[in-house]
Each structure stands twice: as structure tokens, then as C-alpha cells.
């Protein structure tokens, strides 16, 4: 998702892999299945008017296109390529846990949010709180997510 040249990165992984070795990667799929990202990034983008990324630029959903990484693995020289969607749940328990994780750990979010002044940060937090608590009104913040696992052999 974040390598500038994904094919070059895959070829390097294959180069250092022992014959018969196996490699697996995980990438995020469509935003609609990853509310844990879109809840906060949507609020940041709406409020800070960030420019849209260039098509194909490194980013969270860059690899969401069906078959993209499998094709890169094939072009890098891997065989027996397999991919599978793996749903998950991010068990944050509380909104504060979710907020802290997103604003302290998630690199792209930390960078974007860090550029906001205190008033803007509070506005974004209120919007995200409203969005998250609307989706999970019982207070149990167990946020759906989904990834694609792609596997190949040398």
C-alpha cells in the first residue's frame, strides 16, 4: 500500500526469498468495509480540505482493486498465488480508545491531524464521535474492518 513502486518492492522480496519460500501480505480493501479508517479520515478531509491523492499514489486503499497484488506477485515471479478477504473487528471498547489509537499510532492520520490547530482538532473529534456513536449506539466500539491476504510461492 505504501511502497512507491509496488512491483519493484515485490521483485526485491522475491529476490531475497529462498527457493520454495512463501510470502504473504495484507492490504486494506474498499473504504466501505473499513469504517475504522473512513470515520476519522472523512472528518479530516471534510474539515481540512486536503487535496485528493494522485491516482496510484501510496495510501491506505491503494491496493483495493481486485487482483492488483496477485498480478504484481505474478509479474514478480511468484506462483501458486492465492488471495482471500479476511473480515475483522477492531475491538476498541470505547470511543476514547479508538480516538487515541487513530491519533497516536496510525501514520497517515497522525500526520494529517497533526497539522490542525486545537479548534480544528476538537471539531474533527466531535464529528468522528458523532459518526462512531451513530454507527455503534450501544457504546461498544467494535469496528468492522476488512483486509485482503495475498499469498505466493517462489
What are these regions (language model features)?
Residues 138-142:
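Short proline/glycine-enriched turn/loop segments at secondary-structure junctions
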Residues 1-5:
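A short His-aromatic
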Residues 7-93, 109, 113:
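Conserved catalytic/acceptor-binding region of the Class I
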Residues 80-137:
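C-terminal helical/coil "lid" or tail adjacent to the Rossmann-like core of SAM-dependent
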Residues 63, 67-68, 96-100, 121-126, ...:
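Short amphipathic alpha-helical patches
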Residues 76-79, 99-107, 144-154:
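Core SAM-dependent methyltransferase catalytic element
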Residues 35, 52-53, 119-123, 143-144:
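Alpha-helix N-cap and coil->helix boundary residues
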Amino acid at each position: 500500500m505504501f511502497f512507491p513502486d509496488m512491483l519493484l518492492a515485490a521483485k526485491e522480496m522475491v529476490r531475497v526469498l529462498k527457493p520454495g519460500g512463501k510470502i504473504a501480505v495484507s492490504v486494506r480493501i474498499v473504504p466501505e468495509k473499513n469504517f475504522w479508517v473512513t470515520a476519522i479520515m472523512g472528518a479530516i478531509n471534510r474539515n481540512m480540505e486536503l487535496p485528493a491523492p494522485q491516482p496510484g499514489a501510496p495510501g491506505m486503499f491503494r491496493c483495493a482493486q481486485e487482483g492488483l497484488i496477485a498480478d504484481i506477485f505474478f509479474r514478480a515471479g511468484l506462483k501458486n498465488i492465492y488471495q482471500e478477504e479476511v473480515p475483522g473487528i477492531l475491538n476498541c471498547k470505547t470511543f476514547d480508545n479508538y480516538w487515541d489509537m487513530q491519533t497516536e499510532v496510525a501514520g497517515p492520520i497522525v500526520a494529517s491531524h497533526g497539522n490542525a490547530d486545537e479548534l480544528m482538532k476538537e471539531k474533527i473529534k466531535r464529528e468522528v464521535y458523532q459518526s462512531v456513536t451513530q454507527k455503534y449506539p450501544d457504546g461498544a466500539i467494535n469496528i468492522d474492518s476488512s483486509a485482503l491476504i495475498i499469498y505466493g510461492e517462489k
